[in-house]
Regions:
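Mature N-terminal segment immediately following signal peptide/propeptide cleavage
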Residues: 28-54
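Fold-core signature of tandem repeat domains
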Residues: 110-113, 146-150, 156, 168-169, ...
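N-terminal low-complexity, Pro/Thr/Ser-rich intrinsically disordered segments
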Residues: 18-34, 124-132
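Short acidic-glycine-tyrosine-enriched beta hairpin
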Residues: 34-38, 47, 74-95, 174-190
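Ligand-binding loop in jelly-roll beta-barrel domains
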Residues: 93-118, 163, 185-207
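Short, conserved beta-strand element in jelly-roll/cupin
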Residues: 56-71, 160-175
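Surface-exposed beta-loop interaction hotspot
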Residues: 99-151
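Bacterial N-terminal signal peptides
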Residues: 5-16
Length: 207
């Protein structure tokens, strides 16, 4: 009979050889619009097809910009139909494994950002001229971001980013199209951005 140590070693080898699910992106309907060592930004459309089972490697944040439907299947549970309006903040967590399927035509579209740091920073001091101070409380937040939806027709006054940030600037096109994406390093002080008439701005400060 094999010793407990041998059994543990065999188990570790089996676990190490277990097939790994692919990451969610790239896949049909997605385009990477920006990447650095902090974040990867994807323009995602849920086409009318069933995507492979995948595991999210990173925490995910973002915002939808075209209304649409998805079917999300988690484990052995039946698929769940999810309908999403435009301009709704999105999130997911690292380690989540599921199947997605587009269920509408035209497809739902969103800008989704993979936050590469495994855990939020806890050593950030708020700037006295930060967005919270000059614009107000975030429109949305979770454990990985503070996010502001700047009202259409307005622009953020001069402010300083205490954290790395991503700005999404949408034109006034209907339906909405892929935004301009700008990475703003921590410590940057600036005004804006200023959208065109009918456009929208979303600012995500990364935790």
């Amino acid at each position: 009979m094999a010793s407990p140590k041998v059994l543990l070693l065999l188990l570790a080898l089996l676990v190490g050889q277990a097939p790994q699910h692919p990451p969610p992106y790239p896949r049909p309907g997605t385009t990477q619009v920006f990447e650095n060592d902090v974040i990867a930004v994807w323009d995602v459309a849920w086409l009318k097809q069933k995507y492979p089972l995948h595991t999210h490697r990173y925490d995910l944040i973002g915002v939808s910009y075209v209304e649409g439907d998805r079917i999300i299947t988690q484990g052995d549970a039946p698929g769940r139909l999810s309908s999403t309006k435009p301009w709704v903040f999105q999130s997911n967590v690292a380690g989540n494994t599921h199947v997605e399927e587009g269920a509408s035509d035209p497809p739902m579209r969103a800008i989704l950002m993979e936050v590469k740091a495994a855990t939020p920073r806890t050593d950030v001091a708020e700037a006295t001229d930060g967005l919270r101070q000059v614009v107000g409380a975030p429109s949305w937040e979770n454990r990985r971001t503070f996010a502001w939806a700047i009202p259409p027709g307005t622009a953020a006054p001069t402010h300083r980013h205490a954290r790395d940030a991503v700005e999404l600037v949408f034109t006034g096109a209907t339906p909405a199209t892929t935004p301009t994406v700008t990475f703003v390093p921590a410590g940057t002080a600036h005004a804006g951005p200023v959208p065109e008439a009918g456009g929208r701005v979303f600012i995500f400060e990364l935790k």
